[in-house]
Amino acid sequence: KDIEERVREERHARRSNSVNLWFGPDTWPVKQGDVVAYSGDSGSSGGPHLHYEIRDTETQRLYNPVREGIIRPRDEYPPRIVRLHYVEVDTVQGVPVRSVPESYAVVRTAAGRYALTHDGPVGVGRRGYFVAEVTDRRNDVWNSFGVWRVTAFADGIPCFEFRMDSFTYDISRCSDAVSCYPIQINSRNEAIRLAQLEGAPDSFYPTMAERGLIRT
């Protein structure tokens, strides 16, 4: 039986259009040279399509296929910081409150370093965190990409690191916890919160001091 027929049978048997199915390794064996699916213009995100992941069988941790050298796309464009935002946080009668983000445009110099277009130092409150709005491109495609790793330094010392690779399947649902949603919904870039959201998995943050909060 092919996948479509098997899924249809399971949906009818369970009387539900929404089903999560788990199959054994021998259900649909794949040999080298077999066609599993087609990508590109044969499908789109507006209809049924496939996402591929490469995971370690024993740990179920993701492999980053580019970092591991499994695929080597042509990529001559470094990731780019577009804006930097600062959000002050506090607690009022036990309820967390956040200020409206203060936003600063960023330019990349010829030396490859970044500078704010804002004159003078950035003013920060008693406690807060930064949000980096970033994007990435790659040769030969029109897509824009997010980033899988961000490291923040204070006085030359790493104080925060976010890594979005090698996590297990069961915490995939938490992957958006690294985004700053109020900024993300109005941006075409990735808005990475440089602080750990309450409830976000610790494994996303191999380096962490004060949950990424900047205190003055």
Residue ranges and their predicted role:
Residues 149-153:
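Beta-strand signatures of extracellular beta-sandwich domains
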